[in-house]
Amino acid sequence: VALIANAGYEKTYAADNLGRLQIATFDPATHDALAKLLPPYVTVDPLLDLTPMAGDAMYADCIRTILQSDTVDALMISIVPHSILLHTTDDEIARTEGHLAERIVDLIHTYKKPTVVSVNVAFGAGAVYNRFGQILDSGGVPTFLTANRAMICLNAFVHYRLTRHQQYRDAWLT
């Protein structure tokens, strides 16, 4: 599994809840492609913290690059939508073609890898981000309010999928 976040604490919450999932190792092509996309203050890492300085395009380009990688089987995307560089409010979404929610839905359907999204909204501010979550939900993207919950659910889904696909029923019980 790999992770893309724009806040370090979300990265930590997700990492603390990996469960049986293992952190991916980027192949050289993925590492190099990300290095070209990222500013020098961001370290290329499978638990990628874009910082609040990432806009819609950088987020989407990193998601695409990671989903294209043969060494990544699943992805968790964590978004703290308060960043001024992201178009995440209802008003911004209405005015912006190619906003992040739309891009995420398209990318997930293109690459078809297990992916979950956490949209961490501070209490009292959630209403201005309703449309963002609605677009993800209506696009079939599993969406959660916290990174830890998203990672727990991704872990359960991947384990279920492997168990069902490989018919390891005994493994499910362990």
Per-range role (PLM):
Residues 1-4, 9, 15-23, 92-174:
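Peripheral docking tails and interdomain loops at the edges
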Residues 1-89:
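Short glycine-cluster motifs
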